[in-house]
Amino acid sequence: MGTSYRKLGYVLFLMLGMIVEEGIAYVRVKEKQSSPSFMGIYDESAVASDAVPCAEAGQSMLRQKGSAVDAAIATLLCIGVYNPQSSGIGGGSFMVIYDRSTRTPEVIDAREEAPAAATQKMFKGDKKLSSEGGLSIAVPGELRGMALAHERHGKLDWETLFQPAIRLAKEGFPVGSELAMALREQRSHILNSPTLKAVFTDPVSGDILKENDIVIRTKLGETLEKIAKNGADEFYEGQVAKDLINDIKSFGGIITAEDLKNYQPVLKNATVAHLSGCLTLYSVPPPSSGYILSFILRVLDKFHFSKASVSDIENATLTYHRFLETLKYAYAYRTKLGDERIENVSSVIAELTSEDVIEKTKQKIEDGKTYEPLHYGAQLATNDHGTAHISVVSREGDAVVVTTTINYWFGSGLRSPSTGVILNDEMDDFSAPDIQNIYGVPPSKANFIVPGKRPQSSTCPSIFVNKGGDVVMAIGASGGTRITSSVSLTSMRVLWLGRNIKEAIDEPRLHHQLLPDEIEYESKFPNEILEKLKAIGHKTKPAGAFGSLVVGIKRMKGGTLTANYDYRRGGSVDGSK
């Protein structure tokens, strides 16, 4: 008998499994949970999502014998409809694909990029211009990234993948709790944006939609139908492209028809890092943060953590101090990275991957001492924002992890009236030469705006594989600059501290990104440890309401899969027995 636990929520991270029996997903759920989320335990595969219709979208592809990539694409399209505050075809993505049969990973970089007319000083020192309105829009990459993945690994027809999202958009759906929250937080902006107001307000009251109100995205549904029929090029070169460009121009944007036509995703090698226990970590290269994650975990690996490392207050304080100091060194490197197609970041990558540098970094961490930011090599850090995440582990052992985003809530705050597409504000992820931080430290030149360049990202969708070639863990997160620290802390807890995937995700988190020089801590983090960290010299502040959210799949020693979503936003799990 099948069992499913579901809760609507903010799209963060999805786990898609490949096994169903006669269309029914089977699941065993661990009892006595410590949080509202459920850890599903499956013999072969799992599905977990915070958006019920979108988990169904992925499963419908699997029932039709689709590939893991097919399921991921269908789910991405669905969440772009269902959770417009965080994702959609007006944005971009990073995808890691692992082929079990050949034991090879690959990365598809479909990050948004700067238009040809973009310049370093286009915002004239006005931060608002980079985060709202037409100038904040970068060239979207999501659909061509999907198309490349489908061309290489898809089994079902392209048009088939769009059907669940099209139905959802045209028939409508109840506003979930997290979309409702985003609408409340952005109420003033929604009411003052004619293009968003047309979809997300009640025509009778004139106020924003509330939870369980029905939202219908007819125009977007029509656009998806055209792309389903004509292929991704419809968005980049067809009538949809023409309509989109006209709307962007009316918003004061500078993206041209040539910008759209010329956009291409980039097929890349995955980052590779070897950890103790004969594990290999595959993640995403610049402009994303896979090398930063690998650096963090390789340094931490040298401390030989175990369950005893958090067995009491003293040991736990030391462990978290070492973790925080490692983050500081890592985030200093992050500010030096940029789009490797344009910036020469080879020397930075060489340092991040050097065994000698890893060992020296470990040696520089002093157990009873912390320093000011410049000690770690601080430069101005950029902040990125909202994202959504998808992970797939198939029956065949293939894996796909994807991070997708339109950046801040509702992106640029602009919806194309002709197409229904909500447009990103990814230009805000670049550094600007005429904006310094509060420390007077200049911004990183490696992330300055250049036409055709892709901005830095904190995302690090990751796959861990054992020496036999089997996927051990597929993991990722949302939450801007907190993504890398959250994925590293959760991975550390699973790999070395004896936690299962649910315990690792549930436990309260710490974050440090070097600038500002303070620990962000969740409210449930033990106060005794915080006090001891402060005694060492760490500054602390409570984390805000919108931290990072992690979801992961972990394969146990016997081959059983365990999957969990982050209780901080809710979700669902399904799988096969």
From Swiss-Prot:
Transmembrane segments: none annotated. InterPro entries: GGT_lsub_C, GGT_peptidase, GGT_ssub, Ntn_hydrolases_N. GO terms for molecular function: glutathione hydrolase activity; toxin activity. Residues 1-25 form the signal peptide. Expressed by the venom gland. GO terms for biological process: glutathione catabolic process; killing of cells of another organism. It is found in: Secreted. GO terms for cellular component: extracellular region; plasma membrane. The keyword Disulfide bond applies. Keywords: Cytolysis, Disulfide bond, Hemolysis, Hemostasis impairing toxin, Platelet aggregation activating toxin, Secreted, Signal, Toxin. The keyword Methyltransferase does not apply. It holds the Pfam family G_glu_transpept. Dose-dependently induces human platelet aggregation on both plasma rich platelet and washed platelet (max. response at 3.2 ug/mL) and causes hemolysis against mouse and rabbit erythrocytes (35 and 65% respectively at 5 ug/mL). Does not show hemolytic activity against human erythrocytes (even at 100 ug/mL). Heterodimer composed of subunits alpha and beta; probably disulfide-linked. PANTHER family: GAMMA GLUTAMYL TRANSPEPTIDASE (PTHR11686), RE13973P (PTHR11686:SF9). This is Scoloptoxin SSD14.
